[in-house]
């Protein structure tokens, strides 16, 4: 489990990205880069890092499922992920 402060910071960054998304889009399209620079740094989606939604773990993130490989494995073995089954060939 990630530190609570890191998870809280990530949630705050996500909220800022959503809040400024439309404004950023219009400023970029109009080429008003001076105003774009004045926006908060964390409002840029480039600064976001994918984190597991269940544990907050930043490494081993699986985009398709939105969770870390460790949590994915646990849930898959328990049969809690629909459509996922153990491979055998």
Curated annotation (Swiss-Prot):
Record-linked InterPro entries: Ribosomal_uS14, Ribosomal_uS14_bac/plastid, Ribosomal_uS14_CS, Ribosomal_uS14_sf
UniProt cross-references to SUPFAM superfamilies, sorted A to Z: Glucocorticoid receptor-like (DNA-binding domain)
GO molecular function: rRNA binding; structural constituent of ribosome
GO biological process assignments: translation
Keywords, comma-separated and alphabetical: Ribonucleoprotein, Ribosomal protein, RNA-binding, rRNA-binding
GO cellular component terms given for this protein: cytoplasm; small ribosomal subunit
Protein origin, superkingdom: Bacteria
Membrane spanning stretches: none
Keyword field contains Transmembrane helix: no
Keyword RNA-binding assigned: yes
Known role: Binds 16S rRNA, required for the assembly of 30S particles and may also be responsible for determining the conformation of the 16S rRNA at the A site.
Family per record: Belongs to the universal ribosomal protein uS14 family.
NCBIfam families: PRK08881.1 (NF006477)
Subunit structure: Part of the 30S ribosomal subunit. Contacts proteins S3 and S10.
Record-linked HAMAP family: Ribosomal_uS14_1 (MF_00537)
Protein's name according to its UniProt entry: Small ribosomal subunit protein uS14A
Organism whose genome encodes this protein: Listeria innocua serovar 6a (strain ATCC BAA-680 / CLIP 11262)
Record lineage: Bacteria, Bacillati, Bacillota, Bacilli, Bacillales
């Amino acid at each position: 489990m990630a530190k609570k402060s890191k998870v809280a910071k990530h949630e705050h960054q996500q909220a800022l990205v959503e809040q400024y998304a439309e404004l950023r889009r219009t400023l970029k399209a109009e080429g008003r880069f001076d105003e774009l620079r004045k926006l908060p740094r964390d409002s840029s989606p480039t600064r976001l890092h994918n984190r597991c939604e269940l544990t907050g773990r930043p490494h081993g993130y699986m985009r398709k499922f939105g969770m870390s490989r460790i949590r994915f494995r646990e849930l898959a073995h328990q049969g809690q992920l629909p459509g996922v089954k153990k491979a055998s060939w």
